[in-house]
């Protein structure tokens, strides 16, 4: 291995080590309470070295968010694996349950998705990085849009604006999962997460169905 190749490998290993440290710190302290000093200490690097790799706490979150979006899309792709054509309702149900599995199996990534909401995050990262996150996010939303458009073409759904309907479904999923993340709210509602999630998804599908 050449000296240059070794340095590049060491640089990438350091970058990944810092991201792992940030992941641990953000989960332990919460993104908003965590500081760059905390991350540098956990990664065992100087603060100056940390800033050579990531210019802000939001930039660290952005890179973790990209990891999470990649993981989410893998769940969605797996959900669509089938040896026969899927109906529009089957597609939406599979998307819904894939998102729930993502929430259950990758709760840290779900928390990062929620932490990235807000004007401050958008303004704190570079336009290029923000566009990368936006593009990755759109891939998942587009799968929902395409399923709704399929239902409209087949006469199963009545919907004037599939993209707006997809946004509503996304808000519905996140609303249920965020609500049920809190023990007090779960106790208030008195049903399990999967039960409420299924009820919300089926209510959405009933609203989409074209009149008989």
What are the language-model segments listed below?
Residues 1-29, 33-42, 59-62, 83:
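Basic, helix-initiating cap at the start of DNA-binding domains
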Residues 1-2, 98-101, 138-154, 167, ...:
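C-terminal peripheral helix-coil segments that are non-catalytic and often amphipathic
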Residues 18, 22-26, 68, 99, ...:
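Short hydrophobic clusters on alpha-helical segments that form packing/core surfaces
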Residues 44-54:
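Short hydrophobic/aromatic patch on the recognition helix
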Residues 63, 78-108, 166-169:
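Hydrophobic alpha-helical connector segments
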Residues 66-72:
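Short, basic, alpha-helical segments at the C-terminal edge of helix-turn-helix-like DNA-binding modules
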Residues 101-146, 163-164, 190:
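Short secondary-structure transition hinges
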Residues 158, 162-166:
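Membrane-interface starts of transmembrane alpha-helices
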